[in-house]
Amino acid sequence: MKKFFALVTALLFMMLSTAQAEIYPHCMPLEEMSVGGVGYGTSLGYVKKIYGEPVDKKIFTGDGVRVVTWIYSEYFSVTARTSAEDTTPEDNLQVVGYSLKTNALSTPAGLTVGMSYHKVVMLWGRGELVEDDGRRGYFYVPASSQLPVTLTFYVDANAKITEMQLGTDF
């Protein structure tokens, strides 16, 4: 009976592991979704300590949300979001996304704009294909969390990374 129970337990574990891999084949560690120290949940104040004041800001309040985007250049911006009623100072808002179009920053594993997407595939497997406004990209979700965040690697016709974009469903 003990052997039977052990066998059933092992089979269930294998089935669940396989199902998880089939549902989320495009995973990577959440820590690898950051660039230059900026990632999901980082405060805008921390971003400011690293990169200084942004050169421009875009603020949107409506539809129940307040969205603050700090623009450091045409190649790098960071976005935070909270509810429209939330009066938390900008510096304390948490990052929910960024856009990176330069190789000046990289992930902890060294991935950056300008590299071949195949380097990403070698580390984390092929991402889920997304086509957006005529652009082609591959997105990944955090491997060990239920956070609603994705990292998308947009590529050109030669599979060269042209942009890395962290974001949420909204």
PLM features: residue spans?
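Positively charged n-region of N-terminal signal peptides that target proteins for export
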Residues: 1-4
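Bacterial N-terminal signal peptides
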Residues: 8-15
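Sec/Tat signal peptide C-region and signal peptidase I cleavage site
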Residues: 17-21
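A cross-family detector of function-defining hotspots
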Residues: 24, 28, 34, 42-88, ...
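Right-handed parallel beta-helix
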Residues: 94-98
